[in-house]
């Protein structure tokens, strides 16, 4: 059976792995998941990520980051989902925790943070909140 929301699965795997203090987590890979992992790395929420070939299928491995024994990612929340897509214009992109967190947005110019989307002047689909 196919997965109905692979991005929500990715976020859940990251949350669950951090609860049990795993150093890394592996999942099936896709272009959107790689783009999200790239944003998380650029913002300092994860150590690193790598795409490997396992049993003929691409696999995304994410190295998780901790500070003083606690996960760096405190909140990882899916916003737009298959049953209810959430699109925001450039002026309506939300601030997460008054700018302390990040909203990951899928725009016509690629997947980026809310700050970069506002600076670029584009809106798009709000994928998730990270704090």
UniProtKB/Swiss-Prot annotation:
InterPro entries: Ribosomal_uS8, Ribosomal_uS8_CS, Ribosomal_uS8_sf. GO terms for molecular function: rRNA binding; structural constituent of ribosome. The keyword Phosphoprotein does not apply. GO terms for cellular component: ribonucleoprotein complex; ribosome. Part of the 30S ribosomal subunit. Contacts proteins S5 and S12. One of the primary rRNA binding proteins, it binds directly to 16S rRNA central domain where it helps coordinate assembly of the platform of the 30S subunit. This is Small ribosomal subunit protein uS8. It comes from Herminiimonas arsenicoxydans. The gene is rpsH.
